[in-house]
């Protein structure tokens, strides 16, 4: 369940997100937990990003307070799992010397994965960003991994996190 009317934090590294969750006696969700929590959230392809979920960048637009898009809620009651901000999850992917290809609907220990591109490091383990942001439009889908092998010290206006118990 998410809290409504919270302004999400941005420009957060994976390490800062992990520390913030720990300070709240919580933790970052695993990729599999995130995948279960997103079920039932509208796909950004269902509208132009202005009514369902905050997925369409418009000049002057920022991430919206949680729950401000009434229809952007998952079956589990989590707000804004698609759009608003990309979210760090606990899982890292192993070292990779190249990033290429597409994964879709593949069952793995870390959940169903779909690679859509994103900033990547080469040759180092990387953290995962899930869900897309208001900056990504239709790429902000429920199965999107918008960063594969992203350095965990990366920050961005469209990067945030959520905590789990």
Regions found by a protein language model. Give the residues of each.
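Surface-exposed recognition segments
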Residues: 85-165
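Short aromatic-cysteine micro-motif
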Residues: 1-79
């Amino acid at each position: 369940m998410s809290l409504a009317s919270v302004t999400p934090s941005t420009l957060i590294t994976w390490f800062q997100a992990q520390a913030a969750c720990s300070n709240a006696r919580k933790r970052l969700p695993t990729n599999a937990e995130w995948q279960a929590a997103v079920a039932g959230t509208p796909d950004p392809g269902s509208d132009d990003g202005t009514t369902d979920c905050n997925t369409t960048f418009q000049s002057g637009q920022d991430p919206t307070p949680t729950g401000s898009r009434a229809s952007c809620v998952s079956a589990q009651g989590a707000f804004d799992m698609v759009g608003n901000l990309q979210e760090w999850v606990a899982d890292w992917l192993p070292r990779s010397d190249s990033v290429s290809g597409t994964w879709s609907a593949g069952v793995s220990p870390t959940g169903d994965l779909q690679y859509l591109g994103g900033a990547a490091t080469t040759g180092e383990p990387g953290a995962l960003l899930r869900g897309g942001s208001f900056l990504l439009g239709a790429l902000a889908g429920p199965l999107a991994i918008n960063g594969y092998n992203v350095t965990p010290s990366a920050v961005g206006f469209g990067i945030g996190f959520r905590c789990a118990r």
